[in-house]
Amino acid sequence: MSKITSSTLLKYKQEGRKFTALTAYDASFAGAFDSEGVDVLLVGDSLGMVLQGHDDTLPVTTAEIAYHTRCVRRGIERALLIADMPFMSYATPEQAMINATELMQAGANMVKVEGGHWLLETVTKLTERGIPVCAHLGLTPQSVHVFGGFKVQGRDAENAQRILDEAKALEAAGAQLLVVECIPAPLATAITQALTIPVIGIGAGASTDGQILVMHDVLGISSGYIPRFSKNYLKQTGEIRSAVRAYIEEVAAGTFPSAEHTFS
């Protein structure tokens, strides 16, 4: 079984082959997702909400992400493993270097950071020192209080152009992947077509190169607010592994996300 790398995902993009990603936080679920063929696993700071019960992701620490990264690493053989850098863990390039090193040593293949132009120097410096970076634009949950809540981003022409420009700049700075969250589908299409690197969408339509969801949403075990862009695959299959396979199959076929999971 060949390991998934950033080069694998780039090849998938070039071939027009859609790929899947899920969040994971422990060895057991990660192992199940990995063995069923999920290409990318993210130890997300979403754990602050789905595991710890917080209202947002801000309380999560680098040490907590590192702990769960070690857990996930022990459970997988194939998938590319990305670790989120938590709120204020990369406020400066120097701080980012220290915390990203901890996550890479915990077993991550790549780290993910949220933000646009202000991050360019950090992305370049991490990349130059052997730490691959996944960027994240659109609805960036660590900025939820700046946005005034979990809201769709890039609906007006000015902000859409800003997000597109930031995507291009992050690629030029060295980012190897890009996540776009809760943006209109036409904007996600424009970004995906403009970039050479693979683009992963969540609430961004079906045109992106890959899709990512939070595992708790896929399995229908999230409490409280359920995002419009999510889908409960366990409800339609009744078994965890079957739910994961259904997710993979629908992404590959381009039937997920459908219009009901997409913003205009």
Swiss-Prot record:
GO MF term set: 3-methyl-2-oxobutanoate hydroxymethyltransferase activity; magnesium ion binding
Catalytic reaction annotation: 3-methyl-2-oxobutanoate + (6R)-5,10-methylene-5,6,7,8-tetrahydrofolate + H2O = 2-dehydropantoate + (6S)-5,6,7,8-tetrahydrofolate
Which pathway does the protein contribute to? Cofactor biosynthesis; (R)-pantothenate biosynthesis; (R)-pantoate from 3-methyl-2-oxobutanoate: step 1/2
Q: Which UniProt keywords apply?
A: Cytoplasm, Magnesium, Metal-binding, Pantothenate biosynthesis, Transferase
User: Could you name the active-site residues?
Assistant: E181 (proton acceptor)
- EC no. given is 2.1.2.11
Q: Which domain of life is it from?
A: Bacteria
Could you say which enzyme class this protein belongs to?
transferase
- InterPro entries membership: Pantoate_hydroxy_MeTrfase, Pyrv/PenolPyrv_kinase-like_dom, Pyrv_kinase-like_dom_sf
- Give the cofactors, semicolon-separated: Mg(2+)
The biological processes this protein is annotated with in GO are: pantothenate biosynthetic process
Q: Name one GO cellular component term.
A: cytoplasm
Residues reported in the UniProt entry to bind Mg(2+): D45, D84, E114
Cite the SUPFAM superfamilies for this sequence.
Answer: Phosphoenolpyruvate/pyruvate domain (SSF51621)
Its biological purpose: Catalyzes the reversible reaction in which hydroxymethyl group from 5,10-methylenetetrahydrofolate is transferred onto alpha-ketoisovalerate to form ketopantoate.
The record's similarity note reads: Belongs to the PanB family.
Name of this chain's protein: 3-methyl-2-oxobutanoate hydroxymethyltransferase
Q: Which organism is it from?
A: Shewanella sp. (strain W3-18-1)
Name the gene for this chain: panB
